[in-house]
Amino acid sequence: MQNALSKLDQREHVIATINKRIDQYHQAKLPVIFIQHTEPEMEVASKNWQLFDRLHALGTDTFYNKTRPDSFYQTGLESFLKMNHLDSIEICGAQVEFCVDTTIRVAYHLGFTINLLIDGITTMDSNLLTAQQIKQHHAQIWKHRFTEFVTTTSPINC
């Protein structure tokens, strides 16, 4: 959910959904982790790299940079989760077919229980499919195989 992704489908709705869940985690005093992608168009500290201003990120949250779609690859995320005895994670963000999909599959292979904030994920239209088609396609693959879907009314399961 970085500035470089300004053309995300239903961006404002997704940000509002994510913020509601972030607020629930903050109220429960549970960790909130932000993963920021870095590449030539999204260099660290650049405007494109920065999180959307509207996200309810706090200085006390945990932040990692990544260079691959996999949020675990050379980030310290797996160590953080294990050191904090967290065996389940909740995922939200963008982009469905890149970072979200890869992170779900890697987390699954690492043995984590995964909950997906289904209204808190998005992507952009491709040359072949709309963002909604991409999301629906991936959701059909993930559901009950790799992850369970949650909403902002679901209890937090950590």
Positions of PLM-derived features:
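Short acidic, Gly/Ser-rich segments with clustered Asp/Glu that frequently serve as metal-coordination loops
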Residues: M1-S6
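A short alpha/beta connector and helix-capping loop motif
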Residues: K7-F34
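Active-site-adjacent betaalpha module
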Residues: A16, D23, A28, P40-C158
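Conserved H-loop
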Residues: H37
